[in-house]
Amino acid sequence: MYLTFDDGPSELTGKILDVLKEQNVASTFFMQGSNLQNTGFQENVKRTVKEGHYIGAHSMTHNSEKLYKKGQFVPEMKETLDLIHNITGTTPKLVRPPYGSAPGLKGEEIRDQIVEAAIKVWDWTIDSNDWKLKDNPTQIIENVKKQTTEEVEVVLMHEKAQTLQALPEIIKFYKEQGYEFGVYNDEDHFRLNFQKDQRL
């Protein structure tokens, strides 16, 4: 099972990494270019990779108008992947579309562009809804538990204070259920997009 964190890096990245290290869990992060450009966050970006986590791209702007209506999805993802490479030395190919691939990647043309750019896309199987549950870690934990039904789950979370509070309990739950934690690997990509496009 895969824990994933969107919208970093942030002032909470280091604290999330501390919890993951303490629990001996590797995770997958989808980071935003505008935040990656903040030099104050870059040490923790390097630390993320150093401690065995994967960093994929979550666009430069997180702006659905630009990404999906003005044709900037692939250019923004490439720019973000380049930033990740420049900071960490890794060469990731995985991206997560802001707001998910449905409806953003509905059009065949945008998906063709993604394939041409040799980019892979990941959505999620469990939405924790953490971003809108300020001061309510208990509900985040419940959301994750009640959606867990499959052998392989990909949990969508964000770098938020309430998520940090919920994280130890979420990890404990999965360990008790006998799940093994995985970290994304470009070599072992499996399809996980709401458009069910085998190419992505």
Label each region the model flagged.
Residues 1-68, 72-86, 173, 189:
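Active-site beta->alpha N-cap acidic-glycine motif
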Residues 62-187, 194-198:
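Catalytic domains of cell-wall/extracellular-matrix polysaccharide-remodeling enzymes
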